[in-house]
């Protein structure tokens, strides 16, 4: 653990920021229950394991069935924290507010991107956003007039890629599913040939297991068997998925990852919950984000999130 006086400095157009190292506090014990995103499952595990090395008397229960399971658990009081890979829907905010009398507090804790994965041998250099819609969508609301069902329509005619494209994606309780539907399909409908998987790891494994497959999933689950395609408005302006293009949000499907909590306005959080969130929004917590293959939030954003805990 870094010394508590160490800080990580950064500057932006709006000023200079200090991201503090985490400082251990006395008397932290209890149990945290987390219900929500599969995308954040590994990261929640990393955070909880490292936090337990600081506070052995703390226990965690982590359930990762999808972002849509987080709001009901917070409303019913069966979860302390609700990890989500998408923003809350207006209806979810209304339901929470109706129950508790105030809205939920939403913290940005990491950055991710929804990647379009192909197997590592696939020669496709990249895709336009219109092509992505034409591959995955039944309705093609993003502008394409022709559905894409074969690799030859994307300029790939190598042996092994002459059969119809096999499609993989997430199931409907996933925040990744809902966000991809909005961002990539212009809120259209998925083709019924998309093989829905319970987790991003399953999507990546399916794409890597044989030629001719393509799938969308959280970039943090990338393996050596797949490649994330550059994307853009045109084939002449493809943007690779990298830490820079995600953090500056130029990659088309960049997104924040969130933790939703129940914080009554004007009252402090319980000590255990506050300290766990302070750890996440510290140098050490953001190092775990990198460890899991995601991207730390910009320092100016992080400082704003820490203020929400006050």
Language-model features: locations:
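Flexible loop/hinge segments at secondary-structure junctions
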Residues: 2-310
């Amino acid at each position: 653990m870094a010394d508590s006086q160490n800080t990580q400095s950064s500057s932006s157009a709006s000023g200079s920021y200090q991201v503090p190292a985490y400082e251990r506090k006395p008397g932290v014990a209890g149990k945290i229950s987390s219900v929500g995103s599969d995308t954040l499952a590994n990261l929640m595990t990393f955070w909880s394991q490292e936090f337990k090395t600081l506070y052995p008397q703390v226990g965690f229960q982590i359930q990762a069935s999808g972002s849509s399971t987080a709001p009901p658990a917070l409303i019913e009081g069966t979860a302390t924290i609700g990890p989500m890979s998408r923003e809350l829907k207006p209806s979810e905010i209304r339901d929470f507010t109706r129950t508790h009398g105030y809205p939920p507090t939403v913290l940005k804790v990491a950055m991710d991107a929804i990647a379009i994965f192909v197997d590592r041998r696939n020669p496709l250099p990249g895709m336009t956003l219109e092509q992505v819609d034409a591959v995955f969508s039944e309705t093609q609301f993003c502008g394409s007039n022709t559905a894409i069902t074969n690799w030859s329509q994307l300029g790939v005619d190598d042996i092994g890629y002459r059969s119809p494209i096999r499609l993989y994606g997430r199931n409907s309780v996933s925040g990744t599913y809902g966000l991809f539907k909005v961002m990539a399909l212009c809120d259209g409908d998925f083709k019924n040939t998309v093989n829905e998987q319970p987790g991003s790891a399953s999507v990546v494994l399916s794409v890597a297991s044989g030629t001719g497959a393509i799938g969308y999933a959280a970039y943090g689950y990338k393996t050596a068997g797949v490649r994330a395609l550059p994307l853009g408005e045109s084939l002449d302006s493809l943007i690779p998925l990298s830490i820079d293009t995600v953090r500056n949000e130029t990659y088309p499907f960049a997104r924040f990852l969130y933790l939703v909590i129940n914080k009554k306005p004007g009252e402090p959080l319980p000590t255990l919950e506050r300290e766990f969130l302070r750890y996440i929004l510290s140098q050490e917590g953001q190092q775990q984000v990198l460890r899991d293959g995601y991207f730390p939030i910009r320092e100016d954003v992080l400082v704003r999130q820490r203020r929400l805990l006050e």
